[in-house]
């Protein structure tokens, strides 16, 4: 794995295209604007706007590291890339011979697509709020559709809230966050139908102090359970002696008396499918969102760990029932992308 905050511009686009074309023609694999069939390992680069320790990005990074350890990819990444620099870093990786570029396009949707259009022989797989475009065949999208696991954590949270006052703190009210909050709230209502919700967004993907201060305010306003969509929330919960629900990653090891349950996002099914398609030369404009769902192994409820045996049995019975129904297709968690509101 190579960490590459910035890449040299030593290889020009003309030289790169000539080299790639020659190699592909030699192998008999050149197919014009279609992403090339790749030999192992696939040169894969990731562009992240936040540190790799951040919840969401850490799951992509983890999957990429695992793929490199298997020998499937040769992985480089840039973290803390500003939105204004994002397209530039994408181009630098493209000019340096990378076959697959992954990352998050939420704040640079148009710019990312423009870069992909310039490099039709490279496969791009980026987190996005929008669907793929047929006229951009090398640009696929993904998202964290872990609403099933979020719903299950809500069932648990509702059963453990004495006050019925629950706080939810997120980064931005975008569909990727909104749907998880709504699913969590729906789960809460299963075991605590009269629950009240305080909802707030801190306007950042990585600002633990801001998340912590927002959590303090909610606790002061009566919340005894917090949905920690961002880092910092569980710190406040731990300090004030209230409970929290984790999102995307399992942080219970750091908060053993605070984090009751977590909805886990596994990026491996998404990345592995992209790797398979790049190898086969079949990568195309596609929505990979389904690979984040529980049925595909992209989401799961983390083990209760220190809270095993502390959740009411009735709630756990419902969790197991719903989990089985989700896996069989008999229950579908509603996907609501509208901004959630306090009530």
Kindly give the residue locations of the regions a language model identified.
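An alpha-beta-alpha
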Residues: 64, 150-195, 199, 287-309
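Short beta-strand elements at the ligand-binding edges of bilobed clamshell
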Residues: 133-156, 168-173, 256-269
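N-terminal secretory signal peptides
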Residues: 1-31
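Periplasmic-binding protein-like
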Residues: 98-105, 125-127, 221-231, 247
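Hinge/cleft segment of the Venus flytrap/periplasmic-binding protein
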Residues: 279-343
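Extracytoplasmic "Venus flytrap"
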Residues: 43-70, 76-86, 106, 173-179
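Flexible loop/hinge segments that line or gate small-molecule binding clefts
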Residues: 117-143, 248-258
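C-terminal segment of N-terminal export signals and the immediately downstream linker at the start
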Residues: 10, 32-45
């Amino acid at each position: 794995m190579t960490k590459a905050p910035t890449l040299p511009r030593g290889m020009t686009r003309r030289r790169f295209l000539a080299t790639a074309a020659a190699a592909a023609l030699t192998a008999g694999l050149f197919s014009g604007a279609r992403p090339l069939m790749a030999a192992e390992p696939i040169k894969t680069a990731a562009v992240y706007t936040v540190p790799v320790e951040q919840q969401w990005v850490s799951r992509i990074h983890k999957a990429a590291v695992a793929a490199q350890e298997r020998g499937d990819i040769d992985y480089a990444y840039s973290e803390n890339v500003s939105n204004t620099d994002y397209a530039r870093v994408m181009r630098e990786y493209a000019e340096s011979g990378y076959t697959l570029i992954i990352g998050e396009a939420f704040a640079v949707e148009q710019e990312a697509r423009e870069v992909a259009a310039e490099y039709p022989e490279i496969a791009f797989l980026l987190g996005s709020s929008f669907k793929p475009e047929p006229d951009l065949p090398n640009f696929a999208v993904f998202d964290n559709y872990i609403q099933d696991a979020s719903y299950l954590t809500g069932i648990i949270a509702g059963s453990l809230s004495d006050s019925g006052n629950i706080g939810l703190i997120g980064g931005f009210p975008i569909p990727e966050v909104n749907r998880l909050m709504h699913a969590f709230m729906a789960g809460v209502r299963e075991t605590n139908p009269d629950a009240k919700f305080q909802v707030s967004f801190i306007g950042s993907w990585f600002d633990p102090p801001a998340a912590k201060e927002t959590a303090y305010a909610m606790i002061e306003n009566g919340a005894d359970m917090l949905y920690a969509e961002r880092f910092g929330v569980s710190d406040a919960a731990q300090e004030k002696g209230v409970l929290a629900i984790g999102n995307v990653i399992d942080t219970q090891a750091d908060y053993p008396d605070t984090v009751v349950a977590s909805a886990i996002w596994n990026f491996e099914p998404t990345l592995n499918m992209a790797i398979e398609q790049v190898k086969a030369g079949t990568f195309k404009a596609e929505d990979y969102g389904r690979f984040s769902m529980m049925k595909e192994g992209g989401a799961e409820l983390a083990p209760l760990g220190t809270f095993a045996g502390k959740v009411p049995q009735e709630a756990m019975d419902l969790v197991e029932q719903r989990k089985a129904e989700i896996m069989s297709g008999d229950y579908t968690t509603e996907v609501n992308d509208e901004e959630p509101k306090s009530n």
